[in-house]
Amino acid sequence: MPGPPFLCGETVDLHTVVEADAEFIARGRNDPEVRPWLPRSRPHTVSEAREDVEGYMSDDSDGLGLLACVDGDPVGLVSMFMVEADSGRAFIGAWFVPEAQGEGYGTDAVGRLVGYGFDERRLNRIGAAARADNDASRATLEKLGFVQEGRHREHYYVESEYVGQITYGLLESEWRVD
């Protein structure tokens, strides 16, 4: 069972992670339909997921990991990482289990995290990246106003081939335009 809600969206709530969430995180990251989209070629163990959870729960980290939940059940994870408070910038990432994909949860969850970053963390810039062939992730970022800033050719090695990466950025002033 996830921790209490931290941010509430229209379709998903973003809950704090607790130790018991490590199994969901490992299972989700290893799912055959999720894993190819993540920058990792080997299994993600429950032990590694526990370390991730400890990092999310730590007071020493400026980063943040939250479970995206629908009716209290976890359907994915959104995170803010590489936070540089002095420079006002961070990166975000997200993944969702297959049965939750295509329902708008990603747009709602990532949008809530972006709003939190700009409103409460006083960030000026949020970056993100997606595989060049990940149309769903790219559409989510673009729908939220992220601007394509670069392309890294043959950045990932996935399923016996190299695939590019698209990098995105969103400035606080661009977020406020809406």
Model-based region annotation:
Residues 33-55:
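Conserved GNAT-fold acetyl-CoA-binding loop/helix
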